[in-house]
Each structure stands twice: as C-alpha cells, then as structure tokens.
C-alpha cells in the first residue's frame, strides 16, 4: 500500500516541500535562515493576533491600551515584548538570509530572488506601520517624517501625503489605517513566502560549492528537519533571553512618552533595522534625491543577477570579490550606526561616504573584481 503522504492531494504538496524534497547534501548552517524566517513569521502572526485583541487604534487610547496589555492582560507583557523583539530577530535572520544569497550566488535563481526582494520591501513596510501603533513620541514623529517623504514626488506629492494621512496631519485616521495595514500585510507576506518556496522548489536549492548538485541529493527529512529544529531552538533561546532580560535594549526610550505633536524629539531615530535605509536617505541633501536613494538602496538588490559576470558561482573561490563583499558588510554596519546618530558633523560626512560606497561596491567594484578574476582564470 502506497504511503498516504505521497497520494493525498494536500499531503502530497507538504511531502514534496518538506519531507521528500531532494536537497544538496552539502548545504551549511547559512541555509537554516529560511526556516528561521518562517518561524519568526509564525511567532509574529500569533503574538500579533493576541495583541490585536486588546489594542485600540484610537489616538486617545492607543498608548494606554499598550500599557493595559503590559499591566493587566495575562502574560500581556510577554506577548508584547515577544512581538517587539521578534521583529528584531526577524530582521536579523532576513539580513543574514540576503547576505548568504549574495555570498553564494543564490541571486542567479532570479524568480526566487525577485520575490525575495518583494518580501523584503513588504516586511519593511509592515515593520514601519507597526512601529507607529504604540503611539509614543518616536512612533508619531517617525510616521510624520517618513510619510512626509512622499511629498517629494513631483505634482502629486502633497495630495498623496494628505491621502495617506486621511487629513492634514498624522492623526486618528492615520493610526486606524496603519493598524489595518499592519494586520493585513503579514498575510500578504505569507502568500509571498509560498510563491518564494514554489519558485525555489522549481529549480532546487543552491549549495556552498556553486556546482550543480543534481547527482548528489538527499531527502530533506530527517537530515535537514533535525538541523532546522536545532536552529529554531537556538533562535527561540536568543529571543527569550532578549524578552526576559533585555526587553527594551533595541527600543527607543522616547516611545514611553505619549505622542505629542507640539514637542519634537531631539532627533528622529528609527528602529535599528530601518537605520541603514534612513542613513542613506539623510545623506542626500535633496529631498527627492534622498527618497530615490532610499528606494534604490533596496531595489539595487535586483541588479545582482544582471551585473554578475564571473565564470564562478558564489564567492567561495573568488578572493578579490570576497574582500569587496566583507567591505560591503562592514559598510552596512557603519550605515546602521549612522542612522541612529544626530544630523551633525562628522556623522553627516560619514553617512555620505558610506552611502556612496554602498552603491559603488554593488554597481562598480564587484563587477571590476569579477572581471579581474576572470582574466586570472583565463591566464591559467
């Protein structure tokens, strides 16, 4: 009798995706982050659902409702901090996942890569509208500053900003619609994830060697399910250490002050995972130029399949491009740090240099490095 999981219409899909999936036998722990992102998404949806049961999206009561969740709801403090710090864990896994894709040349699976970029943008949008919901000082001013950027769009900018605000300033209508967006976007992300997996399983996973692994594959279960469970346990351990011992270490103290439109904070500081894009935005003195640079800082990831001119896939056997890659990663850390600093010298200058370097490495230096490596290969 044939096993039910191979015949049943629904179980067959699960079987082909998570059990009998042919997987390269040499993929390392860097490939764990896809499953960790799936767990992060589940944690965020479950904790978010419980928070939504007690949260009120009204400017008069939003801040109080978050305080009520932490004080009066059973384990409300745990759910709230798991959701807030879960977002940080989500982005840590996301950045590593993208970084691994760049290092090992996974961007050559272009459909999977492009859906991944759409996922990245949607996740950043979800995090932004979610950050506004507690209605603290940084929530309010962050919403005001970031939505105001749309006014840089010629002709329709001002109308577009007022349309998003639902009035002439960030107010009750803005908070209500941001709550609606924050509720629906994770389900759109889930749909994107399924498409991401669909495209990935069409081609099969990449592997660290960059070679075709069709001749040497093993079933996903039990080998990689066990490996993923270890990763998940480590992720949850780090998350719970953050939640139980350092719940506010990644947050902003200003967000414990209720939103006040008459009092501007010393400087607008986004969450750490948005600092990178925010630093690039701030480094351009022109408003429209800044917004364009902000959008391009994410969309430039789509250029990787186009500018790849190397005869080798991935950076394992490419020392010059490898050096460029690690300079690029160091530069990302600098940009993340700069995004949280005041707008004054020397931070503005460091931000400008780092922003130029960010785009130059991707568009120019990596391309030049791969051409040099190709010539070295030819000469041997």
From Swiss-Prot:
Keywords: Electron transport, Heme, Iron, Membrane, Metal-binding, Mitochondrion, Mitochondrion inner membrane, Respiratory chain, Transmembrane, Transmembrane helix, Transport, Ubiquinone
CDD domains: cytochrome_b_C, Cytochrome_b_N
Membrane-spanning parts: 33-53, 77-98, 113-133, 178-198, 226-246, 288-308, 320-340, 347-367
GO MF terms, alphabetically ordered: metal ion binding; ubiquinol-cytochrome-c reductase activity
Subcellular localization: Mitochondrion inner membrane
A Pfam short name: Cytochrome_B
Binding residue positions for heme b b566: 97, 196
Source domain of life: Eukaryota
Bilayer topology: Multi-pass membrane protein
Cofactor binding: number and manner: Binds 2 heme b groups non-covalently.
Cofactor: heme b
One of the record's GO cellular component terms: mitochondrial inner membrane
Binding, a ubiquinone: 201
Amino-acid positions noted as binding heme b b562 in the UniProt annotation, renumbered to this chain: 83, 182
Listed GO biological process terms: mitochondrial electron transport, ubiquinol to cytochrome c
InterPro entries: Cyt_b/b6_C, Cyt_b/b6_C_sf, Cyt_b/b6_N, Cytb/b6-like_sf, Cytochrome_b, Cytochrome_b_C_euk/bac, Cytochrome_b_N_euk/bac, Di-haem_cyt_TM
PANTHER family in the cross-refs: CYTOCHROME B (PTHR19271:SF16)
Extra remark: Heme 1 (or BL or b562) is low-potential and absorbs at about 562 nm, and heme 2 (or BH or b566) is high-potential and absorbs at about 566 nm.
Subunit structure: The cytochrome bc1 complex contains 11 subunits: 3 respiratory subunits (MT-CYB, CYC1 and UQCRFS1), 2 core proteins (UQCRC1 and UQCRC2) and 6 low-molecular weight proteins (UQCRH/QCR6, UQCRB/QCR7, UQCRQ/QCR8, UQCR10/QCR9, UQCR11/QCR10 and a cleavage product of UQCRFS1). This cytochrome bc1 complex then forms a dimer.
Protein task: Component of the ubiquinol-cytochrome c reductase complex (complex III or cytochrome b-c1 complex) that is part of the mitochondrial respiratory chain. The b-c1 complex mediates electron transfer from ubiquinol to cytochrome c. Contributes to the generation of a proton gradient across the mitochondrial membrane that is then used for ATP synthesis.
Stated family: Belongs to the cytochrome b family.
Name of the protein this chain belongs to: Cytochrome b
Gene behind the chain: MT-CYB
């Amino acid at each position: 009798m044939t096993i039910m999981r191979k015949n049943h219409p629904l179980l067959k899909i699960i079987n082909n995706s998570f059990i009998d999936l042919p997987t390269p036998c040499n993929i390392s722990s860097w490939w764990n982050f896809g499953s960790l992102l799936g767990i992060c998404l589940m944690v965020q949806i479950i904790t978010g659902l419980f928070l939504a049961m007690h949260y009120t999206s009204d400017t008069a009561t939003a801040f109080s409702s978050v305080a009520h969740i932490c004080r009066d709801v059973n384990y409300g403090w745990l759910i709230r901090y798991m959701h807030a710090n879960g977002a940080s864990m989500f982005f840590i896994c996301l950045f590593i996942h993208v970084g691994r894709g760049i290092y090992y040349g996974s961007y050559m699976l272009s459909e999977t890569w492009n859906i991944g970029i759409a996922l990245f943008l949607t996740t950043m949008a979800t995090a932004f509208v979610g950050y506004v919901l507690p209605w603290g000082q940084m929530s309010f001013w962050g919403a005001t500053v970031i939505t105001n950027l749309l006014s840089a769009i010629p002709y329709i900018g001002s109308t577009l900003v007022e349309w998003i605000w639902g009035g002439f300033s960030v107010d009750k209508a803005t908070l209500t619609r941001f709550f609606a967006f924050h509720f629906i976007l994770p389900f759109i992300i889930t749909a994107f994830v399924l498409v991401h997996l669909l495209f990935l399983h069409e081609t099969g996973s990449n592997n660290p060697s960059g070679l075709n692994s069709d001749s040497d594959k093993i079933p996903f279960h039990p080998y990689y399910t066990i490996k993923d469970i270890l990763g998940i346990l480590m992720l949850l351990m780090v998350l719970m250490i953050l939640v139980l011992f350092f719940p506010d270490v990644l947050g902003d103290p200003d967000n414990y002050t209720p939103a006040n439109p008459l009092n501007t904070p010393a400087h607008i500081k986004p969450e750490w995972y948005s600092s990178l894009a925010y630093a690039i935005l701030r480094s351009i003195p022109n408003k429209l130029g800044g917004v364009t640079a902000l959008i391009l800082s994410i969309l430039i990831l789509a250029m990787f399949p186009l500018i790849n001119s190397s005869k080798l896939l991935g950076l394992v056997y490419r020392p010059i491009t490898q050096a460029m890659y690690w300079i690029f990663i160091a530069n990302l850390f600098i940009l993340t740090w700069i995004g949280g600093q005041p707008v004054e010298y020397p931070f503005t200058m460091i931000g400008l240099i780092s922003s130029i370097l960010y785009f130059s490495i991707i568009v120019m230096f990596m391309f030049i490095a791969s051409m040099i490596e190709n010539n070295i290969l030819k000469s041997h």
